[in-house]
Amino acid sequence: MEVVHWKECEDKKIDKFPYRGQMHDVIGTSVRWLSKHGDDGHGYPEYGLRLFTIQPGGRIPIHNHFYHQTMYILSGEFECWEFDPATDEVIKKAICGPGTSIYIPSLQPHGMKNTSDQPSTFLCCICNVYDKETML
């Protein structure tokens, strides 16, 4: 059993996210890894629980990944986007506040921004779903 208090976890600023071979700016965002276990064969955990904080006006740009992801909004308000994988155009928007969960399937392009006037937080649970030999 592992027991961790969130304040004991390093708060790491995120500056960039990769998407389609290019790096995209992440604005006003930090993450604390509350739990990460296993090895996916590429230096990433097989399972993880993260606490994200996004400052007012901050955003996470379009990106995707192999792992499934579920986010649970703790505080503030976010506009969440789903993008068409062929065109990268927004195909769905949702305003999400405390108590809302958002599921993102493997490889679905997505992003979000903080639309509130306060730092906003969410938990993010990830689980890798790909074979160790398979990478895009």
PLM regions: where:
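Conserved short histidine dyad/triad with adjacent acidic residue
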Residues: 33-37, 48-65, 106
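A short, N-terminal "cap"/entry segment at the start of jelly-roll beta-barrel domains
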Residues: 1-46, 94
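Short acidic-glycine-tyrosine-enriched beta hairpin
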Residues: 85-106
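Double-stranded beta-helix
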Residues: 2-11, 85-88, 109-136
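Short glycine/proline-enriched turns and hinge-like loops at secondary-structure junctions
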Residues: 45-46, 64-65, 90, 115-117
